[in-house]
Amino acid sequence: MQQIMSCGVAVYPDFEIPGEMERTCAYLRSARALGYGEVFTSLHIPERDVSGVLGELAALGEFVHRCGMEFTLDASGNVMNGFLDDPEKFALLREIPMDWLRMDFGFDPESIRRMVGMLSLKGLMCNASMLSAEEVRELVRMTEAWDGLKLRAHHNFYPRPETGLSMEFLCAKSKPYLPYDIPVTACIPGFQNPRQPLFAGLPTVERHRRMCAGDAAAELKKTGLISSVLIGDPFAGEGELEEVAEVCLGKPVTLRVQTEAEISEQERKILFGGLHHTRPDCPETALRSQSSRGMAAIGTAILPRENGGRRRFDITIDNEKYCRYSGELQLLLQDLPADPRVNVAAHVLPEDWGKVCRILPGTDFRLTEES
């Protein structure tokens, strides 16, 4: 069974800008239509007075709920303690229909207890990038006392280039949550509208800063440690939204291919006759279609053809010389030598090579023919 991750988007609205509310709502509708389930925003807005944004966040949260999405607010302990000490401001904060409060830094157990008692929350998010394994255990013990309150972990994003985490560090910091079944979220950048003031993307992992959103999401999915992906930059492009949803929600990846001139009708049926489900135990050299041999079993024999060497991104089909493997389709991930038992049937178009890394073992892909 393939892993399914949830996905979310971030917005940092300034509704004093003409048309900002309409633009934000349109963006959230588009995200929801693609399967996104969470909206993230932050009180870390040094450019604006914090108290001035509370009414805007309340309006935003209400719209998020009307869309059927969850609303997450990110704040520091210093900011939240300021609200706790100011009844008037805290009353405004309570008007925000937030589901999750992400505790960034500066929180102490007493302030957490006070907030939980005064806010109607679905749960808390801890800072997955910062806590040690012992701190995770302490937090779990503390939150167990609050019946019904859920706990999630959410990694930082890093606006400044060269400050993001390595994949190894991300995995090390994510593993302590596994024994408690605590979901972990990581962030990826969006390139269409990188967030001010640095405009350098908002990834958790540094090498994702210049990686397209779908590829970054696929790399996080491969770890088996990340349960949710958040596009940290606001107003991601439609293509970015689609490719991240495709990866996270397990939607089939579509690859355009050009066929060899001499392929048989039976080979064509195997190529384009339906979805290809990859085996969960694929080798490093290729993605093996688990469903292709079933397609071949009901058709005519696949005769050998003359082939040169097999190249990365070729689509091959085993012929009758491979006996019971006849009909198996493979998408090559490495160059391989020619084999008289294997027909080269098609080639993935160069424009789609980047999408191949999003096809993980146990997931689906579809081939379409380009003339």
Regions found by a protein language model. Give the residues of each.
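Catalytic beta/alpha-barrel core
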Residues: 40-42, 72-78, 98-109, 123-134, ...
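Catalytic alpha/beta core domains of metabolic enzymes, predominantly
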Residues: 127-263, 270
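C-terminal functional modules
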Residues: 260-371
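Active-site mouth loops of central-metabolism enzymes
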Residues: 3-24, 73-84, 102-104, 130, ...
